Structures are given as C-alpha cells and as structure tokens.
C-alpha cells in the first residue's frame, strides 16, 4: 500500500504521460511491468504478444452481435482488441470517424452497449484481474465484466461469489454472465458464447480430484480418472463448453493435444 507521500511522487511522475489516444502496446507494456517475471512464471502466466492477439481478432472477426469471453484473460488483450475492432465497425457503419482505441472522447450508446452486454473476461489471479479491469476502463468501456474466478474450478463459484468483498466488486458482471448459461444448465458448466479467445496458462498440472472429475479429458485412454492433468488440456474442454455448438475457439501457440493427453 502506497503512503500519501509516495502516491504524490508517483502521480507527479506519471501526470505528463499520455495514456489516451494511444495504442494498446504502449499502455499494456506499462501494466505488464506491474507483474513481476517471477510471479508470472510461477503461475504459467505469460502475456500474449499484442501482434498475436491482433492476428487472432482479425481471424475471428468479432461483430457487434457476438458474445465474447476470454477465460484466462491476463491483461485482457483479446477482449480489448475485440472491443476496438467492433467499435471501428460501428462507427464506420454510422459514417463517423473511427477514432482512437484509447481515447477520452465519450462513446456513443452502441459502443457502450456492446461492451456492457457482450464482452467478458475471467482470470484466477487477483492482481492480474485488477490490471485487466484498469485496462478496460482506460479503453473506455466504463463498466467492466472482468471477473476474478478460477475458470477450471467452477464447482466453487457459488462459494466464491457469496463472499461480501467479492460481491462488492464483481457481482454486477457475474449476474450478466449467469444469464448466458443455457436453460438446461445452472451449475456454470456450460455457457452460450459465440467466441472464446484465450491463451491459457501452460505451466503446472491440476491434481485436485474435485476438478479433474468434472472433465472428460481428465480420464486416461482406458477411461480411468488420472491423478494429474496438464492445466491447458482441461482448458480445451472447458473453453469448448463456453461455446455454442457451431462456433470456433482460438488457442494461440497450443501444444499438440495428443502429446499432452497420451
């Protein structure tokens, strides 16, 4: 926690730095610096290069009607890039200047409605979520749906979301996320998103039986539950369950699934 005097020094240093009307690379680099290399490496967290994110967004081509989520959001690059892309489409269709991604200019209702209702992100690391929420606010969404949850361990979501501190920060976004479950599911195992763009953490195995037993990829080739499963393997199944049946998921730099499972 910064003391008032230290905070004053920080503000004095940063006050002349231009954040608005800037590109994502500059702002995101500043926030990635807040996450130490040691901390990211221990948890398998590595921020996806912005040019890779830009390529994925262009390939997936999100539109104003799409529901979008990043299930391992890190600094929320996939969702912020998607927001900027759709905003440009909206403004182009209305004959308005496309403008900058990061800007202090007021957004038109169609832009804010898209972000408020369609764009979500989840991460298990609280500090990373704070960075992602801040980036979303700087981007101009005004109200972020970035949630601090463990995507894989969804059986504990009810327990987590009942905590007062969690509710104060995330409840509004979580209520909107719950509405995207199919009518046949109420345990957070399935959702109805159009697009999932994610770069899940690769480091470490999941060893908790309560998590592994909820995934078909937690079984061995002969059908027995495994004692441990690579985290990114479980993310494959989990992300597919976030999607409607007819759409695709992008994983950048994924290892060969067969090598990981077998």
Enumerate the predicted regions with their spans:
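Proline-centered turn/helix-capping motifs that create local helix->coil transitions or kinks
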Residues: 19-23, 91, 201-210
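Long recognition/docking surfaces used for binding and targeting
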Residues: 1-37
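Conserved phosphate/pyrophosphate-binding and hydrolysis machinery centered on Walker-type P-loop NTPases
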Residues: 20, 24, 46-50, 229
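Conserved Class I SAM-dependent methyltransferase catalytic core
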Residues: 224-262
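A mobile, often basic/glycine-rich helix-loop segment
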Residues: 161-162, 166-184, 207-227, 257-261
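Glycine-rich, acidic and aromatic/proline-enriched surface loops and short helix-turn segments
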Residues: 36, 84, 202, 245
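Conserved S-adenosyl-L-methionine
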Residues: 45-175, 187, 191, 195, ...
